[in-house]
Amino acid sequence: GIMDTIKDTAKTVAVGLLNKLKCKITGC
């Protein structure tokens, strides 16, 4: 349902942000 879609979207955004942080800290 909608909640699942929201959860999936939030997860994707969170992963993207974590990857950006990782790139800043350790390089890509």
UniProtKB/Swiss-Prot annotation:
Q: In which tissues is it expressed?
A: Expressed by the skin glands.
Any single Gene Ontology cellular-component annotation: extracellular region
Against InterPro entries, the record matches this protein to: Antimicrobial_frog_2
UniProt GO BP: defense response to Gram-negative bacterium; defense response to Gram-positive bacterium; histamine secretion by mast cell; positive regulation of mast cell degranulation
Could you tell me which Pfam families the record lists for this protein?
A: Antimicrobial_2
Where it sits in the cell: the answer is: Secreted
Q: Where are the disulfide bridges?
A: C23-C28
**Keywords from the UniProt entry:** Amphibian defense peptide, Antibiotic, Antimicrobial, Disulfide bond, Inflammatory response, Mast cell degranulation, Secreted
Q: Which domain of life is it from?
A: Eukaryota
- Does this UniProt record's set of keywords contain Disulfide bond? yes
Role summary: Mast cell degranulating peptide. Causes histamine release from rat peritoneal mast cells in vitro. Has antibacterial activity against the Gram-negative bacterium E.coli K12 and Gram-positive bacterium M.luteus NCT C2665.
Q: What family is this?
A: Belongs to the frog skin active peptide (FSAP) family. Ranatuerin subfamily.
| Name of protein | Ranatuerin-2SEc
**Organism whose genome encodes this protein:** Lithobates sevosus
